[in-house]
Amino acid sequence: MKEKFHFLPEFRVRFAETDMAGVVHFSQILRWAENAESDFFRCRGVDFATVAGGKLRGFPRVKLQAEFVAPARYDDRIVVKIRPLLSGRDGGEKSSAISWEFVIVAARGDNGGGCDNVEIARGRWTSVYAEADVAAGTLRRVRELPAEIVRALSEFA
């Protein structure tokens, strides 16, 4: 996995995200990565989940791979490194899928020389752009990525 990431949201681990030992549950790691995806689109003015005419268009997940390297702890300063990878027929031009790579790092301690960065997790997931019927609760069809989404992704992919 390349280490060239362009979008790096930061926050601190909240008490509610931990167990009694102060360790973050693994499901939070995936939530942090997904929140970074949402922030990525929001920062670019793209509404990546829309409802119009009773139809929802968004990105259901079709594949996920994650490696949990070290535990995250209460009050760790977390940096989520995320980047999109367009996939499809013409290098993204006619694609319906987006893959995302992520690395989550905790900055810990301050021993006078700064913080130590500890890798918490890394992984990748793939989503497809699809349309669902909200009333019926069914996936209707996979659609080509809209041009505005391809533009938002292409400068970082």
What is the predicted function of each stretch?
Residues 68, 72-77, 85-157:
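HotDog/MaoC-like acyl-thioester-processing domains
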Residues 14-19, 26-30, 34-37, 64-75, ...:
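Residue-level signal for functionally critical sites in structured catalytic/ligand-binding pockets
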Residues 5-9, 36-37, 55-64, 74-80, ...:
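A generic structural signal for short beta-strands and their flanking turns/coil linkers
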Residues 2-61, 130-157:
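Hot-dog-fold acyl-thioester-processing enzymes
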Residues 1, 46-54, 104-116:
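Intrinsically disordered, low-complexity boundary segments flanking structured domains
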